[in-house]
């Protein structure tokens, strides 16, 4: 299988290195990643600016851009052969609930899904800077080898792995997205006249405890796998909204 590997933590991160180290033993791996940290960039693309792309060798490229840029170049820049799977991660920190809308890790995988590729985003609860993510990468290898034939193109598969996990398929749970809320705060520094630098901070207010969610699985020590649809239409109100507007217009 030809696997494009990217992330939002940057080319130097241990998570992406672990995936390549493990997967290249059995698959053709093509690594293309941002030059630096690009967390919380979702599916941002460099539309109006050029990007500097550095070729290390035929299988390794560095992009001064966003994670979705990396996927786009990898798929359409004529640098790699035809890609079968877009793999984003391993992210340092989880992406669950509302996080998926902001995450550059999930955004990169979503861009692959839009272009009709198998797409998997992988995040870990282990945020230690010196952690190597080899155990997580081994689990990803097992998952890909056993289940890639059952996955659908056009779907983003979002996997979150607890820091203390059992590496077996019996420990995997298929889940739905939960909900997480944050209290956002900003601090101001370097204030000169009416100009200041704003820094985002804050804390988590809470997350869902509903059974069947990614949060419930993760915090019970299970690996969560959530299929994310590209179609974000809210079908629960579609007919009601259409009928309501039709009555008002007529």
Curated annotation (Swiss-Prot):
Q: What is a single molecular function from GO for this protein? A: metal ion binding
**Cofactor requirements of the protein:** a divalent metal cation
Q: Which Pfam families match?
A: SurE
- Give the Enzyme Commission number: 3.1.3.5
The record's subcellular location field reads: Cytoplasm
Catalysed reactions, semicolon-separated: a ribonucleoside 5'-phosphate + H2O = a ribonucleoside + phosphate
- Record-linked Gene3D superfamilies: Survival protein SurE-like phosphatase/nucleotidase (3.40.1210.10)
**GO cellular component, as recorded:** cytoplasm
* Keyword entries, A-Z: Cytoplasm, Hydrolase, Metal-binding, Nucleotide-binding
Q: How is the cofactor bound?
A: Binds 1 divalent metal cation per subunit.
Where does the record locate the signal sequence feature?
A: none
Query: Briefly, what is this protein's role?
Result: Nucleotidase that shows phosphatase activity on nucleoside 5'-monophosphates.
What the entry lists under PANTHER family is as follows: 5'-NUCLEOTIDASE SURE (PTHR30457), 5'_3'-NUCLEOTIDASE SURE (PTHR30457:SF12)
HAMAP family per the UniProt record, alphabetical? SurE
Give the protein's recorded name.
5'-nucleotidase SurE
Q: Which organism is it from?
A: Leptospira interrogans serogroup Icterohaemorrhagiae serovar Lai (strain 56601)
């Amino acid at each position: 299988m030809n696997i494009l590997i990217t992330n939002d933590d940057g080319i130097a991160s241990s998570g992406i290195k672990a995936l390549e180290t493990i997967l290249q033993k059995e698959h053709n791996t093509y690594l293309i990643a941002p030059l630096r940290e690009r967390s919380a960039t979702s599916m941002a693309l460099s539309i109006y600016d050029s990007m500097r792309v550095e070729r290390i060798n035929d299988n390794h490229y560095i992009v001064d851009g966003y994670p979705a840029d990396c996927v786009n170049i990898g798929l359409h820049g004529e640098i790699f052969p035809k890609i079968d799977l877009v793999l984003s991660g391993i992210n340092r920190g989880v992406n669950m609930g509302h996080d998926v809308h902001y995450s550059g890790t999930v955004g990169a995988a979503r861009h692959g899904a839009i272009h009709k590729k198998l797409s998997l985003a992988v995040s870990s609860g282990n945020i230690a800077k010196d952690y190597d993510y080899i155990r997580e990468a081994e689990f990803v290898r097992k998952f890909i080898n056993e289940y890639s034939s059952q996955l659908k193109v056009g779907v983003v598969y979002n996997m979150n792995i607890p820091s203390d996990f059992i590496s077996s398929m019996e420990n995997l749970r298929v889940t739905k997205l939960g909900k997480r809320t944050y209290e956002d705060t900003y601090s101001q520094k370097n204030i000169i006249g009416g100009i200041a630098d704003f820094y985002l901070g804050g804390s988590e207010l809470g997350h869902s405890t509903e059974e069947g969610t990614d949060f419930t699985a993760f915090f019970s020590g299970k690996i969560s796998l959530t299929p994310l649809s590209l179609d974000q239409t809210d079908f629960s109100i579609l007919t009601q909204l259409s009928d309501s507007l039709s009555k008002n217009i007529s």
